[in-house]
UniProtKB/Swiss-Prot annotation:
Its EC number is 3.1.3.16. This is Probable protein phosphatase 2C 29. Belongs to the PP2C family. It catalyses: O-phospho-L-seryl-[protein] + H2O = L-seryl-[protein] + phosphate; O-phospho-L-threonyl-[protein] + H2O = L-threonyl-[protein] + phosphate. Mn(2+) 2 binds at D75, D285, D344. Residues 360-392 are annotated as: Disordered. It comes from Oryza sativa subsp. japonica (Rice).
Amino acid sequence: MGALRRWLPCCCCCCRGGGGGGGGGSVGDGLVWDVALKAHASGDYSVAVAQANEALEDQAQVFVSPAATLVGVYDGHGGPEAARFVNKRLFSLIQEFAAQSGGISAEVLEKAFGETEEEFVASVQRSWPSQPRILSVGSCCLVGAIEDGTLYVANLGDSRAVLGRRSAAGAAHGRKGKNRVVPERLSRDHNVADEDVRRELKELHPDDSHIVLNTHGVWRIKGIIQVSRSIGDVYLKKPEICKSNPMLQQTICPFPLRRPVMSAVPTIKTRKLRPGDQFVIFASDGLWEQLTDEAAVAIVAGSPRRGVAMRLVRAAQLEAARKKDVKYERIRTIEKGQRRHFHDDITVVVLFLDKCRGKAGRGDEIDGTDGPVDVFSLSPDDREDPTRPVLR
């Protein structure tokens, strides 16, 4: 009953921090937003988003309570519908199942992911006759949860969670800076660019020599999609839908499937927090396409906390500009939609881990203001004062 009381008061207080698209952001760039710094049960967190697509396909949310902290980053593809659906349902399901089970566990997270997938698939099956495009909409899904000193990371797709932790190994090898902060990847990229993922798919589909194809130097499942696990992408999980409809065979699914070629079963990592653990970076692949794990961790470790998520976004944009041989200032003036030619939507949540090192989060650093982006807060304390992106 104690766990039930800890979770139930938080289950229906979802406050939207703005409306999606336009407005806010740093001077000269209306497509970036951030929550500079707020408190959670184990420290502080910082959030930032940069829109590149015509419709923002990334979604993010943070839940804060005395019992637990949840972080979600959802990177949509084919449209924003799946990511928005996950943003609406997943945390409620995690809270519901955690209350029933007496707390968060790997089983709770897997069950919540599975129920979210089932609900979205059911919604698609109702909608596709009037909106066939919805069959090809999907979302990567990355969730982090902290409860009772344990960190859980559940993942579908290629969004990524990277821990920054202090290492004492340098002294043993005669190097300076024995307490430097080093990265530890907490999630697995379900992307066929990874040879292990390609091998896994080939083993699951031994009778399909075209299960993964390299087109223009990029590996894709059936030559179509790079990620192997997601919420949605119903046309790649329910072959019977396309088989029964000639029109869909010509448009949405122009190839026969013997069986589903994608999965919604998450990879889940459980880790007891340790005194040397400093922070976790949760981000969509828009960040990781531009920055290595090492570079991202070094930026956070060497920067002030306030606005650190935005600092990562700007570093990614700088790298995108360098790759395209254009000035960073030019990217900041490019409209949504066109900006996708330079970088993807980028979403970053940096979660600092103070309490496990004997230091509580600082409530006086909570700040927020209105901004039109779908960054959600589920904190009970935010019912009358929702988390809102800060004008930077």
